[in-house]
Amino acid sequence: MDKIISFPHIGNYHVPIECLLKFIFTDCTVQAAPPITKKTLELGSKYSPDFVCAPFKYNLGNFIEALDEGANILLQAGGGCRYRYYGEVQEQILKDLGYNFEFIQIFSGNINLVTLYKTCRKYGSRLAFHQFIYYILLIIRMIRIMDKIESNIREKIGFEVKENSFENLHKKFLKELKTAKNFHSLNAINRKYRRQFGQLKINKPENCLKVGLVGELYSLMEPFSSFFIEKELAKNKIVVSRYTTLSYLLFEKSFKDRKFLKEAKKYLKFHIGADGTTSVAKSLMLARQGYDGVIHLKPFGCTPEVNAMPMLQNITKDYKMPILYFSFDSQTSETGIKTRLEAFYDMIIMRKEKIL
């Protein structure tokens, strides 16, 4: 039987992940799960425990869709919260549904290159270790390039002169990114699109509204799970800042938690788990930088982010900066989200006008 490897979606990171797996598993078929839709959430919710978090349901729905398209090896990555324990539950649910597959789990706090290389060899990789390291470094570079360009898009897309100019160029960028085979071609793509994005015309006022996004990583990085909240903000000509990216999670977070505790010592005495500490520290940073507001995103029942909320309320009190809280689950209404966003937008406009 041919090996078909698949993995769940999170933002646009299926592009570098798919590239990496194709480099490593040359004798296997690699395909990302189908793009997330309402059907994905419906499937995941149908077979998940009722009170499990939304990312679990999205991933389970992705796995079911991938298996239905022929995948027989599934890849799952765990994080710093209880989600790291969900892999076993998802595997058992899928096997109870009658699917036959192999399940590979990777935990972010327990990754080393030698173990990862041995795991890849076990599942059919023929790369020598130095080749494996080369492709890992190539994909790390790809992720950093992608995150930097997308951060630039978030800051400017709300002020584009020609409608959809940023989005259309972004799609071309992601498509061409898949063609990169080495550092030379990857850096050429980076230079090309940095230049092209820089040439897009924008009409950005001097005192534009600035809003930061903080919260749980999946709700921040997977736009479908938050009803494309970044696009909604951009429609109202708001600069959007989001610091939680794959680059940050992989290469910065573990080194910065102690620094964050020190910077936010008035509000935090201890690390509160997963992304909670980051949410508090980044909200404090945004308040000090004069941002007009912060939006806090989390799945329903996310313990670390629930722990962070009292500290965020204290930051609001001390800095007079409004924070809007959203919790997402399979029953969340898009209409309700948009209504609350409109009210938040009206409030920060009035606050801005009063200050100016």
Predicted feature locations:
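An N-terminal assembly and electron-transfer interface module characteristic of large anaerobic redox
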Residues: M1-L356
